[in-house]
A protein has these predicted regions:
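Short, conserved, GDST-rich strand-edge loop motifs in beta-rich repeat architectures
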Residues: 147-163, 280-303, 347-360
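Asp-box/WD-like beta-propeller blade repeats and closely related beta-sheet repeat scaffolds
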Residues: 104, 112-141, 147-157
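Loop/turn-rich, solvent-exposed surfaces of beta-rich toroidal or solenoidal domains
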Residues: 259-314
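Surface-exposed loop and turn segments in beta-propeller and other repeat-based domains
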Residues: 27-33, 73-82, 119-129, 178-197, ...
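Beta-strand-rich domains and repeat architectures in extracellular enzymes and scaffolds
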Residues: 30-58, 278-280
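Beta-propeller blade signature
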Residues: 160-175, 294-316, 357-367
Length: 368
């Protein structure tokens, strides 16, 4: 797919294409520059404003759709007012901002990004990784929904964690009280007693439906939040290429990244009119070994041997075409609706340009 470039004035015509088509393309409408020099380690964008996290400074930066910075806030890592690595960021519809660190701390922030409160659960999270642009924090019906493993001492690195435990917590942000939510359905191979590569868990919510994905299975599992998170159905989004290293002979084997690279869901966006899956295809063993892609110095070469793809699943489970995303487009901040523009980080390393600002592409999904 070729990414088309249109001026902003063309947006109305683009959005008015036939509603019957299942073929889509990705259009770059514009770009904005945020006058900040630093890395982006997680973020969100909703209702005309965005926020991103800079790891080196333990800082959040909030900006608007013109690129203007409204607030910058660095946080102490100990003592009063500490906020530790708030990489997961989610705005609510009414403008509240919640954050989670990659090791489980949960926060609510004021509109000027100062700390409003730390949300403390009765038990600690046992997670030691994750965060960033993974989608594992959301808000529904006055409750936070979070991937927060640790209830009853559950270890998320146990090979049967996904099979044996609830995967999410529904959290009262005022009290820290929580109830467990969502069990993996039998449609997932992780419900069995076999061993597989450890996946990342992501989810999103639209209305009363929660959609959950494990990163190395091409499936979306759908649950009803109005019925305590009961399982409804599973959709296989049928990628034409999504490599997988299969069943392991013993636990704690890590094959992906050492001998080959699994296909992986990188981001998941759930909207009223459809779910968008952003995934990478993976790299087979022969290419991986020949090019020594297990070495950190060669990690940037991954982009030479696999594609990154968007695919849309309609509410009635009709699948779109595969929309190839060029690598100059990096992680997506959020997709609020299939008919709304959204923002994605420009990959300056891939483009080969060093700038003293951060560029976000303004994008739109358009039916052909």
């Amino acid at each position: 797919m070729v990414v088309l470039v249109y001026g902003c004035s063309d947006q109305t015509n683009l959005s008015s294409k036939s509603s019957e088509s299942t073929d889509w393309e990705l259009v770059i409408l514009d770009s904005i520059q945020v006058d900040y020099l630093g890395s982006v380690g997680g973020g969100d964008f909703r209702n005309g404003k965005g926020v991103f996290f800079n790891f080196q400074e333990n800082k959040l930066i909030e900006f608007d759709s013109t690129g203007k910075i409204h607030y910058e806030r660095s946080y102490p890592t100990d003592g009063p007012g500490k906020v530790l690595y708030p990489t997961q960021l989610r705005y609510t519809d009414d403008g509240r901002l919640f954050a989670a660190s990659f090791v489980g701390w949960l926060y609510e922030l004021n509109r000027d990004l100062t700390l409003k409160q730390e949300i403390t659960l009765p038990f600690p999270s046992q997670a030691n990784d994750g965060g960033g642009f993974f989608r594992s924090l959301d808000f529904w019906n006055d409750s936070l929904i979070s991937y927060y493993p640790g209830r009853d001492g559950a270890n998320p690195y146990d090979p049967y964690f996904i099979r044996d435990h609830f995967l999410l917590e529904k959290i009262d942000s005022k009290t820290g009280g929580s109830v467990p939510l969502i069990k993996i359905p039998s449609t997932s191979r992780y419900s069995s007693d076999k061993f597989f590569e450890r996946p990342w868990i992501q989810f999103g919510i639209s209305g009363t439906r929660l959609h959950l994905a494990l990163s190395n299975e091409p499936m979306i599992h759908v649950f009803d939040l109005n019925d305590g998170g009961s399982y409804l159905h599973t959709v296989n989004f049928k990628p034409s290429k999504f490599l997988d290293n299969g069943e392991h002979q013993e636990k704690y084997q890590y094959i992906s990244g050492s001998r080959m690279l699994d296909g992986a869901i990188r981001q998941l966006f759930v909207t009223e009119k459809g779910t968008v899956v952003y995934y990478e295809e993976g790299i087979d063993e022969e290419i991986f070994v020949q090019n020594e892609l297990n070495l950190p110095k060669n990690f940037p070469k991954y982009k030479d041997f696999q594609k990154q793809v968007l695919k849309i699943i309609s509410p009635d489970t009709i699948l779109s075409n595969e929309i190839i995303v060029p690598y100059r487009i990096g992680r997506i901040m959020n997709i609020e609706g299939l008919d709304k523009p959204f923002y994605a980080l420009r990959d300056d390393d891939f483009v080969g340009e060093e700038q003293e600002y951060i560029t976000f592409y303004k994008l739109l999904l358009v039916k052909k």
